[in-house]
Each structure stands twice: as C-alpha cells, then as structure tokens.
Amino acid sequence: MLDAQTIATVKATIPLLVETGPKLTAHFYDRMFTHNPELKEIFNMSNQRNGDQREALFNAIAAYASNIENLPALLPAVEKIAQKHTSFQIKPEQYNIVGTHLLATLDEMFNPGQEVLDAWGKAYGVLANVFIHREAEIYHENASKDGGWEGTRPFRIVAKTPRSALITSFEFEPVDGGTVAEYRPGQYLGVWLKPEGFAHQEIRQYSLTRKPDGKGYRIAVKREDGGQVSNWLHHHASVGDGVHLAAPAGDFFMNVAADTPVSLISAGVGQTPMLAMLDTLAKEQHTAQVNWFHAAENGDVHAFADEVSELGRTLPRFTAHTWYREPTESDRAQRLFDSEGLMDLSKLEAAISDPAMQFYLCGPVGFMQFAAKQLVSLGVNNENIHYECFGPHKVL
C-alpha cells in the first residue's frame, strides 16, 4: 500500500502530466528504444509510428495518477492490458526496464526533484506488481489447460482462403500434432513473425473466428495500406509455412446464458470476433434471439456473408441486417445488402428492445461510438454494451 504522502505527491503532478500530454510518452519510448533496442522485437512499431501506442500509454499513466488511491477502479484496465501483455510474453524483469525509463523521463522533462521521483518510483512499483501477479496467473491458466502451453508454440498454416478483396482467413495447426487450448469466443491469438526482410520480430493479435474445436485455430486478416504484417500474410505467407503462436487471450468475450438475447454489431473486419460468437451460439443451439448487424463499404469487401447466413439458418431466432455504405451496381442487382448508407439501428428497434439483451461491438472506433450512441438513445444500458478495439484501447 502507498502512504498518504506518496499519493499526494503523485496526484500533485497530474496538472503537469495533462499539460505535457503524449509528448511525455514520446520521450519515454524514444529513450527506452535507444537504451534497450531489443524491446523493438516486442513492441508493435507501427503503433509507435502512428502515435497510437504513445497516446494509449499517456492515458494509462494519467488514469493511474488520478485513481492512485482507488486501485479497484483501474482493475478493468489492468485486466485488458495484462491479457495483451501475455500475448507479447512480457516478463517481470521488463517492468524494471520500463520503470527505469519512466523515472528518467520524468526527471529529464520536468526535473521535479527527488521527492517526486521517489513517490513515482513507489507508485510504479505497486502498479508493476499488480500486473506481474495477474500476468503470472494468466500464464499459469494458459499452460494448465488441455492443449495449453507456455511461451510460444510452433504451428503451420494449413489453409489460406480469400474471403473478400481485403480479408483473407488463415488456419493453423500445431507442428507437434497435439491438441490446442480452448478459448472464449471473442478472444484473440498472438501471432509471432520475423520473415526475411523484416527489421524486427513482429507480434500481432488477431481475433479467433470460430468456435474452439481442439484441433487448430482460424483467424482472418485485413490487408491494411502500409501494413507490414498484413501485407506479408496476404502476399507471401503460404500453406505449409511455420508461425509461432502465443496462447489465446483477451478480456473481450461472450459469456451469456442460453436464454439471454444477443446482438452482434460490427463493421468491416470488426466482424472477426463476432464470427466466433455466432459460431458458438449456433453450435450450442442458443434459444434466445440472436441479431447479426453488419456494415461494409460494398460487396467486394464484405467477407463471410455465406458463412453467416449458414450459421443463422441453424438458430431458432435469428435476425440479420447488412448495410452497404456505397453499394455497387452488382450489389444492387444481386440484392446482397438490406440497407444503403450508414448503420441505422432505429429501424430495428423491435429486435433490440429486450432489456436483457447483451450487445457486442467491434469495428473502427468511430463506428463503435456511432453505434453505441444509437443504442443508448434507444434505451440500452451502458452495462449491456461490450466492445473491442483493434490496436491500443480507446474509450467510446
């Protein structure tokens, strides 16, 4: 526990942190990668270049300082970050490196004096121990499962299937021929790659896209403009190639009773965790209402449409609605969509009126903000809305 003086000293630095903003974390990362370049093998350098990770770390530091005397308020954020850390195989000793550079950054940018640095050192130590303890639990849980493992495990690609102009699915099976650990629908897989020509090892998290079967895993990857890993997977990865995988993880998952109605709301590649949820609901013959609401640019980039239809037909109470923002003439001729333009949930108010319904959202942050605002305006409780951000977390 932190003493009152330490808490007061840390909280007194909040105005300085807010005034400095993400420049603080930019300095921190630049310093850390200069002194410990081996960490470039772990961090997503694309998120470093676009600033997303720097903004996310700043928000986390500011949130910790603001809630330092109320750590339970931070536990949801701790769980989200700890789950992601296990996908990167973060180790306790790496927290010492981060702590060293965080304190050095505070000293170099603000010269706040030893009392402030000591207070932040104590505060960081408490938070680091919370993460280390929770991550140790997750590592143990993953290794103890049937088909589970520690660290990373070699797999090979056994299927590569284009699903749209931008999305391709990949299926993996373990090289050792053993079983693989189950996961909760909505969780992701840690994919570790360092192909020829990559400056650093790259680690990405991709949502699992079907119900666990104990034999292997399936993900689906959108080819991003300028995306190093997604373009390599689309253009160079082949059936038979090897990859290393970290065990499934993530704090976003579906956990509902058979009589709980569910709405799965997505845009673009945000449908990937929803596919695992829908597959699970279908395989378990979910008896309550299931809604599948999806938005895409047009039919060229709309993936898994046939699979969703097939799964939906097996459910006793299923409603699907698809929006195309800019449908092609072919889309119109084939009637591949239900509505044109942006997703408008007010048209389907009757399908989402049950107060017990749980809503799962995934897609671009702007889309999720747009959809969540509509749901709240239609009377949905915020507690019933669950969402996943691809990349560093953002608050809707």
UniProtKB/Swiss-Prot annotation:
- One MF term in GO for this entry? nitric oxide dioxygenase NAD(P)H activity
Where does the entry annotate site (Involved in heme-bound ligand stabilization and O-O bond activation)?
A: Y29
Q: Which residues form the Globin domain?
A: 1-136
Q: What residues does the FAD-binding FR-type domain cover?
A: 150-255
Q: Which Gene3D superfamilies match?
A: Globins (1.10.490.10), Nucleotide-binding domain of ferredoxin-NADP reductase (FNR) module (3.40.50.80), Translation factors (2.40.30.10)
Listed A to Z, the keywords are: Detoxification, FAD, Flavoprotein, Heme, Iron, Metal-binding, NAD, NADP, Oxidoreductase, Oxygen transport, Transport
The record, for InterPro entries, names:
Cbr1-like_FAD-bd_dom, FAD-bd_FR_type, FNR_nucleotide-bd, Globin, Globin-like_sf, Globin/Proto, Hmp, OxRdtase_FAD/NAD-bd
Protein's GO biological process: cellular response to nitrosative stress; nitric oxide catabolic process; response to toxic substance
Catalysed reactions listed for this entry:
2 nitric oxide + NADPH + 2 O2 = 2 nitrate + NADP(+) + H(+); 2 nitric oxide + NADH + 2 O2 = 2 nitrate + NAD(+) + H(+)
Per the entry, what induces it? By nitric oxide.
Binding of FAD occurs at: Y188, R204, Q205, Y206, S207, C389, F390, G391, P392
| GO CC entries | cytoplasm
Q: Which residues constitute the catalytic centre?
A: Y95 (charge relay system), E135 (charge relay system)
Q: Name one Pfam family in it.
A: Globin
Which residues hold heme b?
H85
Q: Does the keyword Heme apply?
A: yes
Textual note on the cofactor: Binds 1 heme b (iron(II)-protoporphyrin IX) group per subunit. Binds 1 FAD per subunit.
Name the segments for region: Reductase: 147-396
Q: Per UniProt, where does NADP(+) bind?
A: G268, V269, G270, Q271, T272, P273
Query: What Enzyme Commission number(s) appear in the record?
Result: 1.14.12.17
Cross-referenced CDD domains: flavohem_like_fad_nad_binding, HmpEc-globin-like
- Indicate the annotated site residue(s) for Influences the redox potential of the prosthetic heme and FAD groups: K84, E388
Family to which this protein belongs: Belongs to the globin family. Two-domain flavohemoproteins subfamily.
Briefly, what is this protein's role? Answer: Is involved in NO detoxification in an aerobic process, termed nitric oxide dioxygenase (NOD) reaction that utilizes O(2) and NAD(P)H to convert NO to nitrate, which protects the bacterium from various noxious nitrogen compounds. Therefore, plays a central role in the inducible response to nitrosative stress.
What is recorded about the domains?
Answer: Consists of two distinct domains; an N-terminal heme-containing oxygen-binding domain and a C-terminal reductase domain with binding sites for FAD and NAD(P)H.
| Designated name of the protein | Flavohemoprotein
Q: Which organism is it from?
A: Salmonella typhimurium (strain LT2 / SGSC1412 / ATCC 700720)
